[in-house]
Amino acid sequence: PPRTAPPCQPSADSAPLASTPLPVRPSYKPGELVDYTAQDGDTLPALAARFNTSIEEIFAANPIIPRDATTMPPGLPMKIPIYYRALWGSPYRILPDHAFVNGPTLIGFNTTAFVNAHDGWLKTYRTYAGDAWRSGPELVDYIATNFSISPRLLLAVLEYQGGALSQPKPPVDKYLLGQRRIYYESVYLQLVWAANTLNNGYYGWRSGNLLEFELTDGTLTRPDPWQNAASAALQYYFAQISSGGVFQANTGPEGLIRTYTDLFGDP
């Protein structure tokens, strides 16, 4: 059966650090040129913000880039002048971008059939959402469609935090995914909050507007400048509900991604 982690807690002491050491970056001199391969959706303003440099310096280091260019073609090898900022996170990538969005990689995936093949509480769950009664799998598809997020990712989150595919009953805590806002006790609104938070992280990182955020204990973290949008989004999501060792475990190789790969294989 899929591995289910204990529900994510804001305490920094209630979960162990991931057993696999995370990679770290070397130290860089101010303005040192580093190698970077353009990712889907990368723009020069976003890259300048992430690497703490300027668009002009990127142009100077990459004469091949036309002056009127904004969005970079994915796969373009680049040199970027980097200026160190404190608290940059690990370069470990949690999830590739193609596994985050509700896109072509999901052709042929049937959420209802997948959920019904498991013994968890989600397959018998029903709720009223979007002017209709929906089963658990239908709820996942409804939110996946509305937020353009992979239903596989939503299922992995529900399993990791709530045992939705492996446990016969939901956790006693009604705030299933950790959002303790008033009136957010339902699975529906918890999942809406999760999808919205993930999207804010994904598109905020891609645009260059989200460069840092606080964990629940007030600790500041900044995603690695090379980081992909899906991994930055998951870091942002878990920052809302955890800190310290719990945050490191949630975003490390033994965290959510372990549950994802147990369910769906290597993304």
Q: Language-model features: where?
A:
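Surface-exposed patches in mature extracellular/periplasmic domains of secreted proteins
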Residues: 60, 66-69, 151-156, 202-219
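Non-catalytic cell-wall polysaccharide-engagement segments
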Residues: 180-267
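Short, functionally critical alpha-helical segments immediately adjacent to catalytic or ligand/cofactor-binding
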Residues: 59-62, 75, 138-165, 194-195
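Short acidic, glycine/serine/threonine-rich helix-capping segments at coil-helix boundaries
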Residues: 39-42, 59-74
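Ser/Thr-rich, Proline-interspersed low-complexity disordered segments
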Residues: 1-31, 83-92, 97-99
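Secretory-pathway/luminal and periplasmic proteins that interact with or process carbohydrate-rich
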Residues: 67-71, 87, 152, 163-171
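Substrate-binding clefts and substrate-entry loops adjacent to catalytic sites
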Residues: 123-128, 163-189
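Primarily a LysM-type cell-wall glycan-binding module
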Residues: 14-56, 76, 82, 105-137
